[in-house]
Swiss-Prot record:
<keyword id="KW-0411">Iron-sulfur</keyword>
<feature type="binding site">
    <location>
        <position position="55"/>
    </location>
    <ligand>
        <name>[4Fe-4S] cluster 1</name>
    </ligand>
</feature>
<keyword id="KW-0963">Cytoplasm</keyword>
<comment type="pathway">
    <text>Protein modification; protein lipoylation via endogenous pathway; protein N(6)-(lipoyl)lysine from octanoyl-[acyl-carrier-protein]: step 2/2.</text>
</comment>
<dbReference type="InterPro" id="IPR003698">
    <property type="entry name" value="Lipoyl_synth"/>
</dbReference>
<protein>
    <recommendedName>
        <fullName>Lipoyl synthase</fullName>
        <ecNumber>2.8.1.8</ecNumber>
    </recommendedName>
</protein>
<keyword id="KW-0808">Transferase</keyword>
<dbReference type="InterPro" id="IPR007197">
    <property type="entry name" value="rSAM"/>
</dbReference>
<feature type="binding site">
    <location>
        <position position="85"/>
    </location>
    <ligand>
        <name>[4Fe-4S] cluster 2</name>
    </ligand>
</feature>
<feature type="binding site">
    <location>
        <position position="66"/>
    </location>
    <ligand>
        <name>[4Fe-4S] cluster 1</name>
    </ligand>
</feature>
<dbReference type="Pfam" id="PF16881">
    <property type="entry name" value="LIAS_N"/>
</dbReference>
<dbReference type="GO" id="GO:0005737">
    <property type="term" value="C:cytoplasm"/>
</dbReference>
<dbReference type="Pfam" id="PF04055">
    <property type="entry name" value="Radical_SAM"/>
</dbReference>
<dbReference type="InterPro" id="IPR031691">
    <property type="entry name" value="LIAS_N"/>
</dbReference>
<feature type="binding site">
    <location>
        <position position="292"/>
    </location>
    <ligand>
        <name>[4Fe-4S] cluster 1</name>
    </ligand>
</feature>
<feature type="binding site">
    <location>
        <position position="60"/>
    </location>
    <ligand>
        <name>[4Fe-4S] cluster 1</name>
    </ligand>
</feature>
<dbReference type="InterPro" id="IPR006638">
    <property type="entry name" value="Elp3/MiaA/NifB-like_rSAM"/>
</dbReference>
Length: 333
């Protein structure tokens, strides 16, 4: 019996994954720590206030850039997920009881940090009758109420595709409704066994039909081909996805899916161009791009391309600024 570091029995797939050593990253997988006044201030606020962000706790390489933009990401619903995806670092297990005060605390953290844009994501809560829909919706409402000048992007699980649960989130009116497909149909079941590709597309379509700006993400390097990436982009656009981010898979631990390939920046530029051609209103592609990277900028870009006026209280998000991790920026260095 193989034992995981936290003391539990390792799953068969984890033991098989662990037979492959952690891969050496190529030269283009790198970032520079460029701190500025906003990052320094936020760092101090987070430390003094005992606040928790995904940015810090996941060791995101883009924290310096995003915090300079006054953007951050928060995880709700606990630290354990009821589902297991082969790329995801979040633990799988029995979650803690629902914390109904969490929306208020997240909203207060966003206010304390003075964020311009906040991405709120969370774990799947199949243990709850509503799959956690109330928690997601209430966190949007609480954040908007406490921070009228802050954009809110909500990144949700699929709630098993149930319209009545998704509607709770739609009614809270986030600036962006995001659900990540992550990979292509052929390998989807092995990578995300508790999800379904077509169901994820339908979740995005439901968000589109509710009149929201929709968003998804594709992770490359888990066994897909270039042709399958192009097909998935077409599927997403056909489902009504407005914004797409495309990123390189980085293996969190030996127990996770091995990296099948390292996609060069030049290829990311090609995928970005194809996404633009397909009509996505916002595109961000690069090895270290993450789904919440420069999220406020992408939302503003999508609004303009859709011909929708940006609300006055969020006009500060409408600015053109370089994105260091975008593949085209990497090649220009």
């Amino acid at each position: 019996m193989t034992i995981a570091p936290e003391g539990r029995r390792m799953l068969r797939i984890e033991a098989r994954n662990a037979e492959t050593p952690i891969e050496r990253k190529p030269s283009w997988i790198r970032t520079k720590a460029r701190t500025g006044p906003d990052y320094t201030e936020l760092k101090g606020l987070v430390k003094s206030g005992g606040l928790h962000t995904v940015c810090e706790e996941a060791g995101c390489p883009n924290i310096y850039e995003c915090w300079e933009d006054r953007e951050a990401t928060f995880l709700i619903g606990g630290s354990e997920c009821t589902r297991r995806c082969d790329f995801c670092q979040i633990d799988t297990g029995k979650p803690s009881p629902l914390d109904r005060d969490e929306p208020r605390r997240v909203a207060e953290s966003i206010a304390t940090m003075g964020l311009r844009y906040a991405t709120i994501t969370g774990v799947a809560r199949d243990d709850l009758d509503d799959g956690g829909a109330w928690l997601y919706a209430e966190t949007i409402r609480a954040t908007h109420a406490a921070n009228p000048g802050t954009g809110v992007e909500i990144l949700v699980p699929d709630f098993n595709g149930k319209p009545e649960l998704l509607q709770q989130v739609f009614d809270a009116q986030p600036e962006v409704f995001a659900h990540n497909v992550e990979t292509v149909p052929r390998i989807f079941k092995s990578i995300r066994p508790a999800f379904r590709y077509e169901r994820s597309l339908d979740v995005i379509t439901q968000g589109r039909d509710a009149g929201l700006v929709t968003k998804s993400n594709l992770i490359l390097g888990m066994g897909e081909t270039d042709e399958e990436v192009l097909e998935a982009l077409a599927d997403l656009r056909g489902a009504g996805c407005d914004i797409i981010t495309i990123t390189q898979y980085l293996r969190p631990t030996p127990r996770h899916h091995p990296v099948e390939r390292w996609v060069k920046p030049e290829k990311f530029v090609e995928f970005s161009a194809e996404a633009e051609r397909l009509g996505f209103a916002g595109v961000m592609a690069g090895p270290l791009v993450r789904s919440s990277y420069r999220a406020g900028r992408l939302w503003a870009q999508a609004m303009k391309r859709r011909g929708v006026a940006i609300p006055a209280q969020l006009a500060h998000l409408d600015k053109e600024s370089p994105a260091a991790q975008e593949a085209s920026s990497l090649l220009a260095r």
